[in-house]
């Protein structure tokens, strides 16, 4: 009689117990330094990317390059971040997170130190790409350390601080860059990172333990699939980032980038199905909550464009500089530490992390609706209260999102093996990058199209021969005649003034439409939260499980 074998899948409680037993219970000095390294690594990458975007005009002036050439600088950095995200899984599994982080951090600090001294455009692009490749390892590898070495009672605080520093770096960058340019020099947009990174390196050296040699997998990991996927994602991102400037499908460069990137991604998928790779064996990706969390992370990154694009651009159209825009955006960062501490306490008090997400997205939607009352007379001070509410919403939403992602990793088996933790981190890291960058592309295209629409609609009411239009031109011409070379010059200047007013009003209306789009994206995210299944346990239960597992080990000893 033939015997049959039934393989029982581990329950969520068994997976949680195995994960808790593998994590140290006591918080020594080394994990404290490790937490600091995780936080600094998360913040410095985001801060550098924002600094490059804000200082693009200074970089172009430093090199003497055109607008089209300068547009590729930030694209090169972000494309490198997208490239290294999936490839970090292979590097981390091959050499270990600690070694990769130390090499990458050293290289990144040196590159940022010398970038302001470069006067060649091609060398600058190469240096920016190298900076993106080295700093792009910080996100997945530092989070990998946090998930494997931070005691579970302290994990909510680590998650809260991690989310706070990532979110805070976005909001504080305009004020910091404005202060650097006003009191020091624009070069500090890079030297800032070269000073912070060595501190992160010390935390990595003393805070991240040397990993033991991993068992050799039965199947040898292949780097080709990672290379195809990484290069494909990077090319697709570069195409989307430059699409508006290149006029989308009318450009051969855009078409070539999309076609080549799509082909490489398809090649990676074919290779994955034909020859499974031990480093990307991810059954948890097929789970309902994992899919919804990935989509939710995409929506959250899209909603961040309110502070990254909409608010700064609505002020920049009036001629505001970075140091004048900063006070409006920095209000989003003001409540972050307080909210992070409160959110961590709520998680330890058995609060469902989905409720934090829902509260955050609701606050962001309400703040976006308030910002949609924007008029052409608004200044930075008009954003203070709404951006404060936006900051509270962003903090709660991101902390709740990251906390739910970590719980999903615990109960789906994603954190049961070191290789799977790397894959888990890199998967959400890639979505985080694409969500933010693609979100910015979508919003930029949306605002541009809405501005054209509003310009055409407003132009229907401002036509030659209309008595209101003619009266306005004559009145402005009379006022400008004294400082013009003649009547025709005064009338041309008057037409230019009216055209500028129309453009300002059209742009203001398009920004309002952008705020409404963000509000609807928050509503869609709330629907995703409602569809998510509740985790079997919360963070308070995980702490108790870890204590029980430790007690059993001590009893056996």
PLM region spans:
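Cytosolic juxtamembrane N-terminal segment immediately preceding the first transmembrane helix
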Residues: 1-47, 61
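Central cavity-lining transmembrane alpha-helices of secondary-active solute carriers
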Residues: 75-90, 139-143, 330-343
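Hydrophobic transmembrane-helix bundles of small-molecule transporters
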Residues: 178-295
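Interfacial helix-cap and linker-helix signal at transmembrane-aqueous boundaries
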Residues: 59-60, 91-92, 124, 176-184, ...
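Hydrophobic transmembrane architecture of multi-pass small-molecule transporters
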Residues: 18, 411-415, 427-557
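Helix-loop-helix hairpins in multi-pass membrane proteins, especially solute transporters
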Residues: 85-226
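12-transmembrane solute porter fold
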Residues: 31-47, 52-54, 67, 73-74, ...
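Extracellular/periplasmic helix-loop-helix junction of adjacent transmembrane segments
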Residues: 55-83, 123
């Amino acid at each position: 009689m033939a015997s049959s074998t039934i393989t029982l899948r581990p329950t969520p409680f068994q997976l949680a117990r195995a994960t808790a037993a593998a994590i140290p219970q006591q918080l020594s000095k080394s994990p404290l330094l490790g937490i600091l390294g995780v936080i600094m690594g998360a913040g410095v990458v985001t801060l550098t990317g924002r600094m490059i975007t804000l200082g693009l005009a200074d970089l172009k002036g430093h090199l003497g390059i055109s607008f089209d050439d300068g547009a590729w600088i930030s694209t090169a950095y972000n494309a490198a971040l997208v490239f290294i995200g999936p490839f970090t899984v292979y590097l981390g599994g091959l050499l270990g997170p600690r070694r990769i982080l130390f090499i990458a951090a050293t290289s990144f600090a040196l590159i940022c130190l010398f970038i302001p001294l470069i006067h060649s455009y091609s060398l600058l692009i190469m240096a920016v790409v190298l900076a993106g490749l080295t700093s792009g390892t910080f996100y997945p590898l530092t989070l990998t350390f946090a998930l494997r070495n931070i005691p579970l009672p302290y994990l909510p605080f680590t998650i809260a601080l991690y989310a706070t520093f990532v979110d805070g770096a976005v909001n504080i960058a305009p004020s910091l860059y404005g202060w650097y340019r006003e009191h020091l020099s624009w070069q500090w947009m890079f030297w800032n990172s070269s000073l912070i990174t060595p501190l992160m390196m010390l935390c990595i050296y003393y805070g991240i333990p040397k990993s033991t040699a991993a068992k050799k997998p039965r199947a040898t990991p292949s780097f080709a699939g990672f290379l195809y996927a990484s290069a494909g994602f990077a090319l697709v991102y570069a195409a989307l980032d430059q699409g508006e400037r290149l006029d989308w499908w009318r450009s051969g460069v855009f078409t070539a980038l999309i076609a080549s990137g799509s082909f490489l991604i398809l090649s990676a998928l074919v290779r994955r199905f034909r020859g499974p790779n031990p480093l990307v064996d991810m059954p948890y990706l097929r789970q309902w909550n994992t899919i919804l969390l990935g989509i939710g992370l995409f929506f959250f990154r899209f909603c961040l464009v309110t502070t990254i694009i909409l608010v700064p651009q609505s002020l920049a159209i009036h001629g505001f500089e970075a140091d004048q825009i900063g006070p409006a955006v920095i209000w989003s960062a003001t409540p972050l530490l307080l909210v992070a501490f409160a959110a961590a306490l709520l998680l330890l008090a058995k609060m469902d992390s989905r409720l934090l997400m829902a509260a955050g997205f609701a606050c962001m939607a309400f703040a976006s609706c308030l910002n949609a009352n924007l008029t052409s007379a608004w200044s930075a001070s008009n954003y203070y209260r709404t951006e404060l509410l936006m900051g509270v919403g962003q903090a709660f939403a991101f902390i709740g999102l990251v906390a739910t992602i970590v719980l999903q990793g615990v109960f789906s088996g994603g954190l049961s093996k070191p290789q799977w933790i790397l894959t888990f981190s890199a998967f959400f890291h890639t979505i985080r990058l694409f969500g933010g960058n693609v979100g910015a592309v979508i919003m930029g295209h949306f605002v541009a199209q809405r501005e054209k629409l509003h310009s055409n609609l407003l132009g229907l009411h401002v036509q030659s021969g209309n008595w209101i239009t003619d009266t306005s031109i004559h009145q402005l011409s009379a006022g400008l005649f004294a400082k013009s070379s003649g009547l025709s010059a005064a009338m041309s200047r008057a037409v230019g003034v009216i055209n500028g007013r129309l453009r300002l009003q059209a742009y203001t209306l398009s920004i309002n439409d952008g705020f409404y789009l963000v509000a609807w994206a928050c509503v869609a995210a709330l629907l995703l939260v409602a569809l998510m299944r509740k985790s079997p346990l919360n963070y308070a239960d995980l702490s108790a499980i870890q204590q029980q597992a430790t007690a059993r080990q001590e009893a056996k000893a």
